[in-house]
Regions:
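Short acidic-glycine-tyrosine-enriched beta hairpin
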Residues: 64, 78-103
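A short, N-terminal "cap"/entry segment at the start of jelly-roll beta-barrel domains
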Residues: 1-39, 85-90, 149-157
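Glycine- and acidic-residue-biased ligand/ion/polar-headgroup-sensing regions
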Residues: 60-79
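Double-stranded beta-helix
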Residues: 82, 107-157
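Non-cytosolic beta-sheet module surface loops
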Residues: 33, 55-57, 110
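His/acidic/aromatic-lined binding-pocket segments of jelly-roll/cupin-type domains
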Residues: 41-43, 62-67, 98, 108
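Conserved short histidine dyad/triad with adjacent acidic residue
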Residues: 25, 42-61
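Short beta-strand His + acidic residue motifs that chelate non-heme Fe in jelly-roll/DSBH
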Residues: 53, 74-76, 98-100, 106-111, ...
Length: 157
């Protein structure tokens, strides 16, 4: 890993292109090695990407999101899957980021053509225990994803 890494317009521009071309309509750019205890990365989202509501409980980890470009709708869910809170996060403010304790059900939706977020959480990353998905909501690839995205977006109009 490089000693320093600069977050500049060239890096963001290349990641935006990559996210728009990706099947999942998003991409991550890691600044860390997978085994590091502090995971930090850019999460670049394009419109209509879907992030199934989830939490980090089995391997409890706090998370921090800061929007560097664009806007996202950040959703917090109750245990039964009802939406408890919604926060519009924007690079222009007034809300620019959010910090979550482990075990909080959450999701986010991209409200602009593209959104670039800096995300930090505890590591190391282990995909087998990283996330628990909420059973009330569809997983990626499900036929109800488009409808769910539209519903999430409607909460921020």
């Amino acid at each position: 890993m490089q000693e320093i890494q600069i977050i500049d317009s060239d890096l963001i521009g290349s990641l935006v292109t990559k996210a728009k071309q990706a099947e999942r309509k998003r991409t991550n750019h890691n600044f860390h090695e997978q085994k590091e205890v502090y995971q930090r990365f850019l999460n670049v989202l394009s419109k209509n990407t879907y992030i199934s509501p989830h939490r980090h409980l089995s391997d409890p980890k706090p998370e921090t999101f800061v929007v560097l470009e664009g806007e996202i709708g950040f959703l917090i869910f109750s245990e039964d899957g009802n939406i408890k809170e919604s926060h519009k996060l924007s690079s222009n403010g007034p809300k620019r980021g959010i910090d979550l304790q482990p075990g909080v059900w959450h999701s986010l939706v991209c409200l602009t053509d593209v959104a670039v977020c800096f995300e930090g959480k505890s590591g190391p990353y282990d995909p087998t225990v990283d996330k628990e998905f909420h059973p009330k909501y569809p997983l990626e690839g499900d036929s109800k994803v488009k409808e769910t995205i539209q519903y999430f977006e409607s909460l921020f109009i």
